[in-house]
Amino acid sequence: MAKSPFLELSYDILLEISTYLDYKDIVHLSETCKSLSYVFDDKTIWHRFCARVQGLTNVVPVVDDNYKRPYAVWKDRGYAYSWGQQIRNYLGRVVNTNQYPRDRPGALTGKDVRSTIQVQVGGYGMYLLNENGNLYVTGVPNNVGPELMRDLEPIVKIHAGREFCLALGETGHLYQVSLKTRICLTDEQNMLSAYRGRIANFKSGWDSHSAYVPGIGFLVWHTGRESEAQLFQPEASMKEFVLNDYVHCAGFLVYTVASPQKKGAVFRLDLDQATQHTLGRELKRFASHDPHQGWHLAGSFETFTCLSDDGNTVYMGHANTKQVDDDPVIHDFLQNRGIKQLAHGDHHHLYLTSDHSIWSWGVELRYCGCLGLGSLHLQEQTSDPSIVSDPRTARNIVSIPHQIHFSGTCYSVAAGGWQSAALAISESVLPEVNVPPITTFSIIRPSRVPALRFLAAPATRTLERDG
């Protein structure tokens, strides 16, 4: 085969080569000469990098389609934050003292998670995916930070439920992972082996999990029964069915479809039916009143929400929202807010607005701190009727949203169980410090992840939640 000098390759071929290169390679080639700079500064390359980072283009302005700047800002100052219940190191933090309280957002500054592109919160910890496709998990007792999940191929997408996280590998394999288990669901002889490379979307739920395969339907399996997958087909004929978005809650799915005739329609599919041939049914009163507005779905445990494209309309539903004529819950405090994203834990809720602020409301059980508003039970009683601290049940109840303050610009939020997380850009995270080795019995384990640093912020109030 004849060899072709690199500089003589066509523009299209060089763009194709760029898909196999990482950030540093692209930067070095761009700085080599004007010809390569012209190619490797192409907006499609940098848009691809930005698109990998969950929510990044929500926060950093993109000027004249120049995605290079947002990505460079993220590389330099992007951090993952965590707050909430900290037992068994659920937050992945190195230190937890009065200076670094669990009820306020704290940045994870370990080098392995500094380049987090996706964060998911489960019931018993968090999952962080970095730009190299490495998946890290918190909740490891006696560990000093998030721990690498080994024996996985590079991962491109994750979703966490109560006990497990589903992870899609770059070769099309789908994995179900936790601290103690690694199952390749699409491996030969396993239940999803016929669908490797065909899975378009997947969700991990409360006690079951699902994968959507175009033209086939939803494949659903329960925790502990990973050898059995039930097929649920939302329509009698799947040939023309195109899924737009869906959420997997406790015992049911809520979904929207990519059809101009059904834009703005919301459907529910129950998973506890005697037969899996039950069709999805439209929740007619959840239909968007604006024919130009579709829905973005969020959901966890027993709650789901529908967020309009413009971020100004939010409909909420619950496990008991089953009938076709059931009304959505419409909170005035969620309307016309310019919301970019919603996230739900077991009993608490977060939303991110277009001005990059985070708001929270709901219930903190056992004063777990998942609202990120500080130690509400220790603060002086306020005249704000939306904040109630009940020492008899050790819970804080915040009935309307309150802003979470920290010195960072947030571009994505996540919630699950009694924990919360965010991805943000910050200029004021304190430098990393060395952590002394941790001794467990007679084994000495050196620290692998530098200390978390909490970003001090003025004391804040809270926002509320609904039942």
From Swiss-Prot:
Name a GO CC annotation attached to this entry: nucleus
| Keywords assigned | Cytoplasm, Nucleus, Repeat, Ubl conjugation pathway
Q: Which domain of life is it from?
A: Eukaryota
The reply on keyword Nucleus is yes
For this chain, one GO molecular function annotation is: ubiquitin-like ligase-substrate adaptor activity
Coiled-coil boundaries: none
Q: What GO terms in the biological process aspect are recorded for it? A: SCF-dependent proteasomal ubiquitin-dependent protein catabolic process
Protein name according to UniProt: F-box protein pof9
The source organism is Schizosaccharomyces pombe (strain 972 / ATCC 24843)
